[in-house]
Amino acid sequence: MAFKLPALPYGMRELIPHISEETLSFHYGKHHAGYVNKLNSLIKGTPLESCTIEELILGQTGAVFNNAAQIWNHTFYWNSMGPNCGGEPTGPIRKKIEEKFGSFSAFKTDFSNLLAGHFGSGWGWLVLKDDGTADIVQTHDAGSPLKENLGRPLLCCDVWEHAYYIDYKNDRLSYINSWWNLVNWDFANKNLEAPFKWS
């Protein structure tokens, strides 16, 4: 069965002024959709058609892995943001952050600095480690915390250039600083309770 592009959890204009409608139309409508179409073409007529996205990420390499991981990563990224979100975390996620980093401010600085300094394309993640502590990790290109056993994803930020170049040009840090105004802490709290499933 062919995979379908998941619907965005908000409208194309609802992340303005932090992410423009033009960026979303290209990022979601071209890049994310392109990964879905490419994956479907790669697995059509093969036993992989019966696999879930997670199974493809964990069990495959090369182009199948890259496209499956990018589909999952982007879906998770869209859900990591929302209109009327941002601000400081509340609930259990705040406690996890403060236990690990001392304060939300310290966490925010560490996360921003890590992503601003990330070389090339990739992703920044807030994860829950196996020992129950929160941590910040980065993955390169289509890298996945699931594949690399880096912990359970709680939030992510996309630092591929197509995520920000229309709005911020080469100023990645300004994009990251603006992204904090969109962070969906309710989504992070849900991921503390149970792992996110794409399919």
Swiss-Prot record:
Its cofactor is Fe cation. InterPro entries: Mn/Fe_SOD, Mn/Fe_SOD_BS, Mn/Fe_SOD_C, Mn/Fe_SOD_N, Mn/Fe_SOD_N_sf, SOD_C_sf. Homodimer. Keywords: Iron, Metal-binding, Oxidoreductase. Destroys superoxide anion radicals which are normally produced within the cells and which are toxic to biological systems. The lineage of its organism: Eukaryota, Sar, Alveolata, Apicomplexa, Aconoidasida. It catalyses: 2 superoxide + 2 H(+) = H2O2 + O2. This is Superoxide dismutase [Fe]. Binds 1 Fe cation per subunit. PROSITE patterns: SOD_MN. Its EC number is 1.15.1.1. GO terms for molecular function: metal ion binding; superoxide dismutase activity. The keyword Iron applies. Belongs to the iron/manganese superoxide dismutase family. Fe cation binds at H27, H74, D158, H162. It comes from Babesia bovis.
